[in-house]
């Protein structure tokens, strides 16, 4: 593979990152390569270090440098409430809102009616066990307002019916098809505060 193809391949890989298209990816790659001894090597070294240090939290699925993340191990969190999010990006969005002080359960996936995914990918048995063991009083379903997020939410509501915890959903204000990671802090904070019980 010649150098031009190598650069094109790197641009293609960057363009697969969320929020980046070919043009943005090209700008990033060319920026990194213009001063590769400083920019590119620094990025590579940081990525290698992250790869060695970052693990999934054994309890919630968050990413951290410890096997029990800083949220699950914090004595200042409300241990009676769990918010169910699809990915760590949504967890970070909830944290940025500053309005949620409970714990999380990161699904890692969502369910698509079209793809017929196995619901086991959602780690729901672990969630149900946490609800009983940790005496959870409220479960907030904070999946995205996409079709897949709604499908996942309805499946979770059915799955958790045997547990006595209050089950609620983020309030309206989140547009249909919207993803939590793209909402401003004020909108997300209001959606958390005005969450609605699921019936």
From Swiss-Prot:
Record's function text: May play a role in DNA repair. It seems to be involved in an RecBC-independent recombinational process of DNA repair. It may act with RecF and RecO.
Leader sequence segment: none
Toprim domain span: 80-175
PANTHER family (UniProt xref): RECOMBINATION PROTEIN RECR
Keywords: DNA damage, DNA recombination, DNA repair, Metal-binding, Zinc, Zinc-finger
Family indicated by similarity: Belongs to the RecR family.
Keyword Lipoprotein: no
Entry-linked Gene3D superfamilies: 3.40.1360.10, 6.10.250.240, RecR Domain 1 (1.10.8.420)
Organism listed in the record: Rickettsia prowazekii (strain Madrid E)
C4-type Zn finger ranges: 57-72
A GO molecular-function descriptor: DNA binding
Top-level taxon: Bacteria
SUPFAM superfamilies: Recombination protein RecR
Descriptive protein name: Recombination protein RecR
């Amino acid at each position: 593979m010649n150098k031009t193809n190598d650069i094109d391949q790197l641009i293609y890989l960057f363009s697969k990152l969320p929020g980046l298209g070919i043009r943005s990816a090209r700008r990033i790659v060319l920026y990194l390569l213009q001063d590769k001894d400083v920019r590119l090597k620094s990025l590579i070294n940081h990525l290698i270090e992250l790869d060695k240090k970052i693990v999934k939290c054994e309890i919630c699925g968050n990413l951290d440098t410890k096997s029990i993340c800083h949220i699950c191990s914090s004595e200042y969190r409300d241990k009676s409430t769990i918010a169910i999010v699809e990915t760590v990006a949504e967890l970070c969005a909830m944290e940025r809102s500053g309005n949620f002080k409970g714990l999380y359960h990161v699904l890692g996936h969502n369910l698509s009616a079209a793809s017929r995914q196995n619901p086991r990918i959602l780690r729901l048995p672990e969630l149900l066990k946490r609800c009983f063991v940790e005496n959870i009083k409220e479960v907030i379903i904070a999946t995205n307002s996409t079709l897949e997020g709604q499908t996942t939410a309805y499946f979770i509501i059915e799955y958790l019916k045997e547990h006595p915890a209050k089950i609620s959903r983020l309030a309206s204000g989140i547009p249909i098809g919207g993803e939590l990671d793209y909402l401003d802090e004020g909108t997300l904070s209001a959606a958390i505060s005005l969450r609605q019980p699921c019936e």
